[in-house]
């Protein structure tokens, strides 16, 4: 990737702590299957094994991995869907919220901010590839107290 870019971005993978297969695979340098003992609210990311095609890219480009519990998923979905947060509502599902949670948490921790070189001049791109695919579940989660 570096030969095509003047600046190589820092790539961070975020996944459920109960199914951190990318993190475990990066640690050992080969695909590691995770025995999922508890399903995550982040169902689409709770797969337990990295697919071969993305692994060929991830193994050489991921700089950091973050694994998260389900605790803040609903709160973050609600924050993003709050129209006072932005001009438009951001309808983020359970698999889109983790990247935002990681960014917020990283910005609140000075040591992590320094490690990631996060500052007021940073450009951050967070991928969120899911909206309210299950509208009933989405409403239930964002309306929790």
PLM regions: where:
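Glycine-rich phosphate/pyrophosphate-binding loop at beta-loop-alpha junctions
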Residues: 1-60, 113-145
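Active-site-adjacent helical/loop segments in soluble small-molecule enzymes
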Residues: 51-117
């Amino acid at each position: 990737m570096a030969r095509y870019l003047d600046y190589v971005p820092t790539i961070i993978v975020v996944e459920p702590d109960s199914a951190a297969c990318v993190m475990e695979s990066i640690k050992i340098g080969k695909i590691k299957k995770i025995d999922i003992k508890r399903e995550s609210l982040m169902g689409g990311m709770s797969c337990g094994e990295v697919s071969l095609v993305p692994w060929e890219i991830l193994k050489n480009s991921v700089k950091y991995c973050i694994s998260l519990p389900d605790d803040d998923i609903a709160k973050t979905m609600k924050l993003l869907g709050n129209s006072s947060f932005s001009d438009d509502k951001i309808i983020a599902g359970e698999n889109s919220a983790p990247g935002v949670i990681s960014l917020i948490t990283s910005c609140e921790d000075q040591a992590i901010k320094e490690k990631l070189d996060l500052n007021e001049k940073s450009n951050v791109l967070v991928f969120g590839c899911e909206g309210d695919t299950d509208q009933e579940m989405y409403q239930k989660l964002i309306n929790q107290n």
